From Swiss-Prot:
HAMAP family to which the protein is assigned, alphabetical: 23SrRNA_methyltr_H
Similarity field: Belongs to the RNA methyltransferase RlmH family.
Protein name per its UniProtKB record: Ribosomal RNA large subunit methyltransferase H
A single cellular component GO annotation: cytoplasm
General function of this protein: Specifically methylates the pseudouridine at position 1915 (m3Psi1915) in 23S rRNA.
Catalytic activity: pseudouridine(1915) in 23S rRNA + S-adenosyl-L-methionine = N(3)-methylpseudouridine(1915) in 23S rRNA + S-adenosyl-L-homocysteine + H(+)
Pfam families reported in the protein's UniProt record: SPOUT_MTase
Organism placement in taxonomy: Bacteria, Pseudomonadati, Pseudomonadota, Gammaproteobacteria, Cellvibrionales
Known EC number: 2.1.1.177
Enzyme class label: transferase
Gene behind this protein: rlmH
């Protein structure tokens, strides 16, 4: 199983890069998380939110279409399904058994396009709270690591 994280935006602060790297390196080779950073759409003074989301959505879906193997598109969205870490662990176990390579999508500051949300196999919400997107990267990779530790009966989750 290869996990792809498709994230709109680049040039993250050092603490984000360090936090992400810390948890990514803890995951075993067979999970092999891959961060794909996609450019923010141009936001001029008179930009249209829908046009920006559409441009970013095209990049996201293009990256998804180029991801390897049998895939699932999972969009992170405030209106998505809330998961407990144990449920995420169950999903990871199923992905491994079924040979699925999940693509987890973190949208830009304006959210995800309707085309992304409509094409998603699943929509998840990490929290009912609004979070800065850099923090979501660290939170997501930590939760993937935590779910993996549950599957391994590792004491990290306790």
């Amino acid at each position: 199983m290869k996990i792809s994280i498709l994230a709109v935006g680049g040039k993250m602060p050092a603490w984000v890069q360090e936090g992400y790297a810390e948890y990514a390196k803890r995951l075993p080779r067979e999970i092999e998380p891959r961060m794909v950073e996609l450019a923010l759409a141009n936001r001029s003074k008179s930009y249209s939110v829908d046009a920006v989301k559409q441009a970013e959505g095209e990049q996201i879906l293009g990256a998804y279409d180029n991801a390897p193997g049998h895939k699932r598109l999972i969009c992170l969205d405030v209106l998505g399904k809330s998961l407990r870490t144990e449920m995420l662990a169950e999903k990871m176990a199923a992905w491994q058994m079924d040979g699925v390579n999940p693509c987890l999508v973190i949208g830009g500051p304006d959210g995800l396009s309707q085309s992304c949300l409509q094409r998603a196999d699943e929509k998840w919400s990490l929290s009912g709270l609004t979070m800065p997107h850099p923090l979501v990267r660290v939170l997501l990779i930590e939760q993937l690591y935590r779910a993996w530790t549950i599957l391994q009966n590792h004491p990290y989750h306790k």
